[in-house]
């Protein structure tokens, strides 16, 4: 019961929450600087 209720309910919840937050944060954060860096560099170099 413990392995099927406590850890099971906590694992997927934590994984889902962490995955969603990490994916969203990483994607948004990486997308913002990634797109800004190359654009700024290109604009500056050109």
From Swiss-Prot:
Q: Which UniProt keywords apply?
A: Phosphoprotein, Storage protein
- Processing after translation: Phosvitin, an egg yolk storage protein, is one of the most highly phosphorylated (10%) proteins in nature.
Q: Where in the sequence does UniProt note compositional bias of the Low complexity kind?
A: 13-32
**What domain of life does the UniProt record list for this protein's source?**
Eukaryota
Which cysteine residues pair off into disulfide bonds? none
Q: Which GO terms describe its molecular function?
A: nutrient reservoir activity
Q: Has UniProt tagged this entry with the keyword Phosphoprotein? A: yes
- UniProt region (Disordered), positions on chain: 1-46
Keyword Phosphoprotein set for record: yes
Q: What the protein does?
A: Phosvitin is believed to be of importance in sequestering calcium, iron and other cations for the developing embryo.
What's the name of the protein? Phosvitin
Which organism is the protein's source?
Answer: Anas platyrhynchos
């Amino acid at each position: 019961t413990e392995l099927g209720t406590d850890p099971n309910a906590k694992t997927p919840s934590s994984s889902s929450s962490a995955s969603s937050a990490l994916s969203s944060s990483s994607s948004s954060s990486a997308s913002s600087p990634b797109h800004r860096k190359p654009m700024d560099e290109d604009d500056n170099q050109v």
